[in-house]
Amino acid sequence: MWSTAICWLSCISLVISTDVNLYGSMANGWEFVRDLFRENFVQERDTGSSIAIYHQGRLVVDLVGGWFDTSKTKPYDNETLQLIFSTSKSLVAIAAALCVQRGLLDYSELVTHYWPEYGQNGKENTTVADILSHRAGLPDLFVSSFDQYLNWTTMIDLLQQERPVWLPGSAQGYHAFTYGWLAGELVRRVDPQKRTIGEFIREEITNRIQTEFYIGLPQEFEQRVSPLIFTDIEDILNASMLEIYHFHNEARTHQAEIPAANGITNARSLAAIFASLMSNIDERRDSRLLEPRILQRATTLNTLPNEIDITFKIPFPVGMGFMLYEQDFPMFGPNSFGHSGAGGSIVFAAPAKNFSFAYVMNRCSFTPLTINNPRIGMILNRTGRMLDKNQLN
């Protein structure tokens, strides 16, 4: 699991801080990330988490720390996997972009061109772009039981029959769960092998660059998944919302494919995947996933000027499945993109800096993921300043 770090041993410092179970490695000059990351545990902002950074195609920070669960008897280590809620959407967006790159999918094409059954009850003119940029008019879907979320065919049948709550394309409203089934079914339909979205991601993305990301976790990996901790948010959630969150700690949920919300991974893998969208990584010549033109198209703003997202009631700039972060993280230059998830996980890339960052954790918080976030804000602020001054290699 540490082979990538060992490749850079000549310029990487190994870290062992047993008081907070902090382990990992970082390149020379990046030690400040270790120090700030450690403060998350000293100040009890984190229970267990991992953080990783790629710069110029190489892994420069790879750290894990804290505890696997609230019993604090097992370390959170480099074998730990974590459910990341909506950060999962970014991998679905990458899968769709790969299909566009291969000529299998066109963002401007009607969904019915690939999925004829979708064209009913006012959805006939929905485009692929409408689905990927949260404009399809299906931000939510009534289900009689969460068990229905576990059955792909059931969810697709329901979505095919559903009537949109606005004219597709005319407005934007975050599709918290439905995005994954809609986009995932498109990928399955155009894939010559008809793989599920989880299979496609594993075989075309994560296996290719030797990382771990699962939508549909193999049962044998369940013991590696750190349970999410909701102590900090229980008082601000109603009973039904809290039930949804706890549902994501169940093994049956981990093993299903809920692409918008149940991706399971670690920070190292996320940072590597996003780095590989911009360049080859880890000295592997064939590791770049997207051509520059496809990446640019996928990360071009598809939100109208001054548009308010119907779901969030605030502006929410998005491209083709990616959140756009130029306003949230201005220190990393234009065209920064990625996705965050409920509770605090995040991955993003900054093409102007050839930089990618990922953070995942088990202790959930609703603090906004901006430069003022207490867990990652100081790390990102300092990193951005030092990159601007060319003080980091």
Question: Where do the model's predicted regions map?
Answer:
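Intrinsically disordered, low-complexity regions enriched in Ser/Pro/Gly/Gln/His and often acidic
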Residues: M1-W2, Y23, S145, Y174
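Solvent-exposed loop/turn segments at secondary-structure junctions
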Residues: L138, G180, R363-S365
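Cleavable N-terminal signal peptides of Sec/SRP-targeted secreted and luminal proteins
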Residues: W2-S17
